[in-house]
Design a protein with these regions (language model features):
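Conserved loop->alpha-helix
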Residues: 1-211
């Protein structure tokens, strides 16, 4: 589990295919510069969130680590297939402070940035998500975007999906990869765990589910 509070901005330095050059079904190995993330207590097999996706550390050295990413994960996430900056967070420990909200690191789907611009001292971010994700979004609810715990500012259901907006304070823009966003960019989305369980409980108690 994670909190959605980014601990460091690292960088994917190398993307190495795990199979032969002609095998398109294999995954890749990512070599990630830690960007100042403290790796002293990270063991092989531990989890680190990279752009909101939970990955298992399979190699570690001074200032960097490596993870293997399956082709399936690559097809359903953004920002993991080429070198670039990435948000990093180590897995939550029992005694850690929960500064954001409970985040599993399992990406539910991709969203598309429709608007990203300064508004006063902050930035307004608008994202178009699928209806399947949109049904879990609520005003002042939580959502994870590229591994960052954020608060939903508005929700607008549209024929082509659900557009929601977020207000980003200057600190969040400065210390995460969200500062690189622009219209058309794809982002990793994870819905709030509580919203997921509430939806399941409501569907399980419906007359159709009971019959």
């Amino acid at each position: 589990m994670f909190t959605g509070i980014v601990a460091a901005v690292g960088r994917i330095e190398a993307v190495t295919p795990l199979g032969s050059a002609t095998d398109t079904d294999t995954g890749v190995r990512l070599t990630v510069a830690s960007g100042g993330l403290d790796l002293a207590d990270v063991e092989l097999g531990d989890s680190i969130s990279i752009q909101g996706a939970c990955m298992t550390v399979i190699e570690k050295s001074a200032g960097s680590f490596a993870v293997d990413v399956s082709r399936e994960s690559l097809s359903k996430t953004a920002g993991l297939s080429e070198p670039g900056d990435v948000n990093l967070e180590k897995a939550l420990r029992a005694h850690d402070r929960l500064g954001g909200h409970l985040v599993s690191g399992h990406v539910d789907g991709l969203g598309e940035v429709t608007h990203f611009a300064p508004v006063g001292e902050s930035h307004e971010l608008r994202i178009l998500a699928s209806r399947d994700i949109g049904k879990y979004l609520a005003y002042k609810g939580s959502v994870t975007v590229n591994g960052v715990s954020l608060t939903v500012n508005s929700v607008n259901d549209r024929p082509d999906g659900c557009e929601f907006s977020i207000n980003l304070i200057p600190h969040t823009v400065q210390v995460t990869t969200l500062r690189h966003l622009k219209a058309g960019a794809k982002v990793n989305l994870e819905i709030d765990l509580i919203a997921r369980y509430v939806e399941r409980m409501l569907s399980a108690t419906s007359p159709i589910a009971r019959n």
